[in-house]
Amino acid sequence: NSKSKFIPVSNSTDQAAGIYFRFYEKKSKLEIYSEFHYNDSKVNLRDLFVDSRHSRAFSLGIQKGSINNFIFSWEWTKLEQTAGRLIRDAGSWYAHNYVYDGFTNNGEVIGASIGPGSNLQTFEIKKYSKKNTNKYLFGFQILDNDNDYYYKAFDSSNDFRRYWKDFNFYTEFEKSFKNFNLNIKCIYTKSLNYQWGLIDDNSPSYYQPGIDLDNFNITLNLIYFGF
């Protein structure tokens, strides 16, 4: 039967909207940027004004340079649903009722690498040499892993102990010389309640210790320009 080769396709579509803002002042070397998106369309203008937080996500960043080639930066990305999900569930970002794969390409998320339901704050200090041949970077990140899942998984138990949070400390060094470029990056991650897990130690106390993990990673890249 030739009809069995075809899968019915719904005419329903997914809609999204967003705006981007960037301000840069050359003299002070100050940059402010932001991106604001809706994962679902509004019913009308009244819906936009009354429930403006529904299905929203945003990024906000500030970067400030100095005369000594230092750059200070902070960025905040928030994909977690707002409290309005209790009445009007928007679903997690990068997913949709009609377009199940969401904003993806070959199974990979297009956009923030932290994934649906997560939040991230990043603090960085960079230092460049006068000729831009060397770069030194120190950074710190606070990552909330998929709070949307956490609220759904543990809502019935009201278990507020299981937030999965990562703290990343990293440093990077980059040097260019002759036809070579050397890059070394070191990252230390302290993960609290990894995958929302707790250790059952048979203690009568409600506050059980979480599954806390440590990870240290070193990446070295050497690139040759000359072929």
Tell where the protein language model's regions lie, with residue ranges.
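Exposed, low-structure sequence patches enriched in small/polar residues
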Residues: N1-F227
